[in-house]
A protein has these predicted regions:
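Active-site-proximal beta-strand elements of phosphoester/diester hydrolases
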Residues: 2-10, 106-118, 151
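Internal catalytic-core helix/loop-beta-alpha segment
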Residues: 86, 92-93, 125-142
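Active-site beta-strand/loop signature of hydrolases that rely on acidic residues for catalysis
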Residues: 7-8, 24-42, 109, 138-160, ...
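N-terminal, active-site-proximal structural segment of metallo-dependent hydrolase catalytic domains
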Residues: 1-51, 67-71, 186
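Structured beta-strand-rich core segments of catalytic domains in phosphoester-bond hydrolases
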Residues: 38, 44-117
Length: 199
């Protein structure tokens, strides 16, 4: 079975100091997608650039934000990609390193970090712009005809069951009706399937 794992690291260097690299090495994944790396590639040591797993090396492919110590995504893969895409053609979000994709031949894997929008009205407006533009990009992905996996920090709780205090969060970014409807549209109109497995 092909195994894809995803994590929001909240800083790859901090997570590595807390044992994340060893956990990732032991996890026996084919692909590991990470969000919020908060580091430039030049600042990563060799142990962070490639993970030595039980079946071989998972090479890291990185897309950091231009702003140091902020956002960024990466993908570690046991299998060499045929193509690598950094960004989805939207400068506002590509500058923040929010999308990286590898083409593995039979299918593609995407690591995605949706903005949270919680820090200010301006950032919430930016999140809504991201949502519209990413939905358009999903249509492009569908037209390509190649299966794909999106491993993401969506920064949206889709259903009431996904959030402990959903009633008190209905006016907060991350559980706004517009955000939940966006996730619903991606599933129903664009054909995305939502799956989550923990181990």
């Amino acid at each position: 079975m092909f195994r894809v794992t995803s994590f929001n690291l909240n800083g790859i260097r901090a997570a590595s100091r807390k044992g994340w690299l060893q956990w990732a090495a032991d996890h026996n994944a084919d692909v590991i997608c990470v969000q919020e790396i908060k580091a430039q590639e030049k600042d990563l040591d060799a142990s962070m650039r490639a993970i030595q797993g039980p079946r071989g090396e998972l090479k890291g492919y990185f897309f950091p934000a231009q702003k140091p110590g902020y956002a960024g995504t990466a993908i570690y893969s046991l299998h060499p990609p045929l193509e690598l895409f950094r960004g989805f053609g939207e400068a506002e979000f590509d500058d923040e390193g929010r999308y990286i994709e590898i083409d593995l031949g039979a299918f593609a894997v995407i690591s995605l970090y949706v903005p949270s929008g919680s820090s200010s009205e301006e950032r919430l407006a930016s999140k809504f712009r991201f949502m519209r533009r990413f939905e358009s990009h999903v249509k492009t992905l569908n037209h390509r005809g190649k299966p794909y996996v999106i491993a993401a920090d969506w920064n949206v709780a889709h259903r009431e069951i996904d959030l402990k205090n959903w009633r008190s969060n209905q006016r907060n970014p991350g559980f706004l009706p517009e955000e939940r409807q966006w996730i619903e549209a991606l599933i129903k109109e664009q054909g995305l399937r939502s799956e989550e497995h923990t181990s």
